């Protein structure tokens, strides 16, 4: 089975950006340190939309995503994010072509 990805859009509560971004930085540090199956975990501010954040996540496979979801830093993020987020939209992605990091299937 090939790679598995997510595109996630968060609409933040007014004034919550700084605290949300700090939570994300803490979570990303755990991902970098403990998740070899998480190939990309890219978090972005949206130009012209200060209360929007988008994440692109790419996993080696669905099992790597499930392992990501079990990690303490991810569980902490999922518990704490509701303090800062009004709305979350998630698209599950099945990559089929493009330029990917070393180790990712096409």
Language-model-derived ranges and their functions:
Residues 3-11, 40-70:
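Short, well-ordered beta-strand segments in beta-rich or mixed alpha/beta enzyme
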Residues 2, 42-51, 77-106:
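Glycine-rich beta-strand-turn "strand-cap" elements at beta-sheet edges
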